[in-house]
From Swiss-Prot:
This protein's pathway: Membrane lipid metabolism; glycerophospholipid metabolism
Signal peptide boundaries: none
Transmembrane regions: none
Swiss-Prot/TrEMBL catalytic activity: sn-glycerol 3-phosphate + NAD(+) = dihydroxyacetone phosphate + NADH + H(+); sn-glycerol 3-phosphate + NADP(+) = dihydroxyacetone phosphate + NADPH + H(+)
Locations listed in the record: Cytoplasm
Protein name: Glycerol-3-phosphate dehydrogenase [NAD(P)+]
Sequence positions that bind NADPH: Y14, H34, K108, A141, R258, L282, E284
GO molecular function annotations of the record: glycerol-3-phosphate dehydrogenase [NAD(P)+] activity; NAD binding
Protein keywords: Cytoplasm, Lipid biosynthesis, Lipid metabolism, NAD, NADP, Nucleotide-binding, Oxidoreductase, Phospholipid biosynthesis, Phospholipid metabolism
Cytoplasm recorded as keyword: yes
GO CC, alphabetical: cytosol
Amino acid sequence: MEKFSVTVIGAGVYGTAIAVAIAKHGNMVLLWGHNSQHIKILKIDRSNQVDLPGVFFPDSLYVEESLSVAADFSQNILIAVPSHVFRCVLLKLRLNLKNNFRIIIASKGLEPKTGWLLQDVVYDVLGKEVPCAVISGPTFAHELAIGLPAAIELASADIKFRYDIEHLLYSVKNLRVYKTTDVIGVQIAGAVKNVIAIGVGISDGMGFGANARAALITRGLSEMIRLGKSIGAISVDVFVGLAGLGDLVLTCTDDQSRNRRFGMLLGQGMHVDYAQKSIGQLIEGISNTKEVYMLSVKYKVIMPITEQIYKILYENKNVHEAVYSLIRRSYIL
């Protein structure tokens, strides 16, 4: 089987996991992170014991502190950093990139303040001629790293690039790749699912049971579809596929999800600030909620679940009042 090379930008839990998964099958992978002390520990331990205990690096996985070396390693640059630092990382990367590079976005969410899709941030910083792809889907990092079966969605309008990345990912054992050209839909799905997961967590934390959970997931999917179609998603297909429904169900129902656990703490009566501290890791859904809500206002999309979660997080609304507002709202949709 043909071997590939890729540079992974972002040495957190997901970046490390996908680097391990790709390198495990003989592909040449270089992992870069911004925290030099963290990178030194990864080099020494040949593992990320903080985020992925017990998962060790294959011989074909290299760890690097120099962004210049990382950028020069491969034309395929996979970015797996939080959405709020995405632009900053691209700006640093731009100073080191050579010709013919290609960007794979593994980050999920929207850019804070602008609400831009991350692909649009790539085009804004690196130019619209850059080949760009997005990967998304129900893939918890630890399961991906240890090689449990999973499926992922690959989106790109660049057919040649999509073909190359499909074959790179195809080399990963137990990973099934599905293709789409709906780049907008995949990115919107990746942001909205985090918001709904907080809502489902709140419901479960309040002890509302399986019926309420199923209702929130279903109506959350409707909100995802409405927003996606308003912004320019090609069809409903991607939302009922892996990047949409698949990732939504995973994030809403499994306690590996930080967004779900955060919501559960809110539902149990914990204040937003204390719940964040209790989780102890970045919760993408908090910033995603603000950006998704602002997009819903901008495009005049009715998203009642998102609206109530926004009010809980940013307007200090009581969770019980938010639930009552949802139950008693008019039957518009």
